[in-house]
Curated annotation (Swiss-Prot):
The keyword Transcription regulation is annotated on this UniProt entry: yes
Disulfide bonds: none
General function of this protein: Component of the Mediator complex, a coactivator involved in the regulated transcription of nearly all RNA polymerase II-dependent genes. Mediator functions as a bridge to convey information from gene-specific regulatory proteins to the basal RNA polymerase II transcription machinery. Mediator is recruited to promoters by direct interactions with regulatory proteins and serves as a scaffold for the assembly of a functional preinitiation complex with RNA polymerase II and the general transcription factors.
The protein's name in its UniProt record: Mediator of RNA polymerase II transcription subunit 26
Composition bias type Basic and acidic residues, residue spans: 128-147, 321-338, 450-459
Domain TFIIS N-terminal: 10-87
This protein's UniProt keywords: Activator, Nucleus, Transcription, Transcription regulation
A Pfam family reported for this protein in Swiss-Prot or TrEMBL: Med26
Compositionally biased spans, kind Polar residues: 226-236, 341-377
Entry's localization field: Nucleus
Chain segments carrying region Disordered: 96-236, 254-418, 436-459
Xref: PROSITE patterns: TFIIS_N (PS51319)
Species per Swiss-Prot/TrEMBL record: Xenopus laevis (African clawed frog)
Subunit organization: Component of the Mediator complex.
Amino acid sequence: MTAAPVSPREIRERLLQAIDKQSNIQNMVAVLEVISSLEKYPITKEALEETRLGKLINDVRKKTSNEDLAKRAKKLLRNWQKLIEPVTQNEQLVRGIPNLPGSANGGGSHNCKADPAPTNLLAGKPIQELKGRNDIQKAHSPKADKTPKRKRKEHRDGGQGTPGHLSKPNHELFQNSSPPPTNGIGGSPPDNLPSPLDGGLQSNNRLEPAENDKHGKIPINAVRPHTNSPGLVKHPSTSSLLKVVVLQQHSGGLDDALSHQPRSPRCSSFSPRGTRAELATRQHTTYAPKGSAPSPSQRLPGVDSAHQSPLHPSTPPATAKRLESPRQDRVSSPHKPVEQLPSTDCHQVLPRTSQQHIPRSSLVDSQTPRTGFSPESSKLDSDDAASGSDNLKRKKSRLRIECEGQSADGTGKPARVKKERRLTFDVITGQIKPLTLKDPAQVESSAPTEQHRTETDKQDLTLSLPSPFQLTNWKELSGNEIIQSYLHRQSSLLSSSGIQTQSAHYYMSEYLKQEECTKRESRKTHVLVPIVLPSDLPGRTREITSSDTDRIQNQHWPGVNGCHDTQGNWYDWTQCISLDPHGDDGRLNILPYVCLD
């Protein structure tokens, strides 16, 4: 007959019987049998977790002195460890696969770091499937490789190419990106764009038909590169800027038809870089000094003729005159020193004046990109800011004249006098008073009302508020020389100003006097009253009577049932007394019957 198979619980019980609580082996034969049975038994992970046999075997291995048993237990534990941790090894295998080039977000030339996939998804997939996916991505990496090169070429040209070349990335963006959210205008198809953009798209289709054919040759299962990947679109704000430009062109088409211009400046370029460059240069010219003339490199050959054409047709003639006159003065005398404005004035005045005097069409033109930078437009902006800052300066000077007491009309009207705000706080009375009054007329006019008000305030304050010097902790301040010199100087200032009050020095001296008195009193020694031996001693000179027993039980009898100290306190023989025999605040705790020499 064959024995029944042993379960892990029975093995655990047998092992626990063979060892004690500190895992010391009590029965070596039983432990060796348990190790042999565990080496033969096909144990599972669930059984190990349930019985905690690994911990028991490890404790036995540490405590045993038998090397053969320790080696067998260690080998057994290693086998169990492999059984418990296969999942982590698979994760390490998947994690150890290197990132292959040609991924969707990097292209061939950009070895961007790919985001690691979740391990729970990759653990169950074979490595061949991963290799197949990377091979598919490799096959289509030249397309992703061409796009960044073309982008770099456009940025090197600086946005000065033909409209057809510039609109090609826009055409790819419209094809690859998902349609924008329809908010009324943004969902319109590319067919509704103005004629220059249509021409650019048609020329783009004629120039590069092979590039568009490559999109159709991509297999269905291949991973298309995402439009937001850094290899395709370098600037995240490019698409948003292009949408703004297209919407502005679509809304401004009627204005272009009415103005009869030979060529509108907003239709010449669609490069978002031009927009940023122009905004930066406009800011620099706004904060530049007014007297500096533009350099010849900034002045283009067709600037003067283009400026004479009606770029701002809806500008009022009064505004044009006001904008034109400072520029004519500067042209007539270019080396004339002009007053430079602070940058803060220009910054404060420019938004206000530009919103007041520039109409809507010119604002739209200022937001749209232009082919070149015109120094004349920067002159107009700086002149506009200068005129607004002149008005602000005029207002400031008028306010300053009125505050200083001069009449604005030139007549003899009584002007307002500046308020005297030099006040001081009187620490004695707790009132706020003017320190010095410059104008004697003001002193005479304000004297009656001030006197009446301060008298009532004085009465209330003297009744209600104590002096702050009486509430001060003078013990801490009395030993400080800096505080003493400061208070002495303050008291001299108060006495020189004519205020008849008790100074801080007075309170300091009073406090010091009190401190001296208390110190003298504290220097007195605190001892027991010396007991004079009486001539009448009951029990020695005479017999003890009932009055003696009553006195010793119910009355204070110095030297018999207690004693007095120098402060008049009575102490029983069993009470502890705290004395100061030397007067130096040193306390001596003794019992009253102790004799002090």
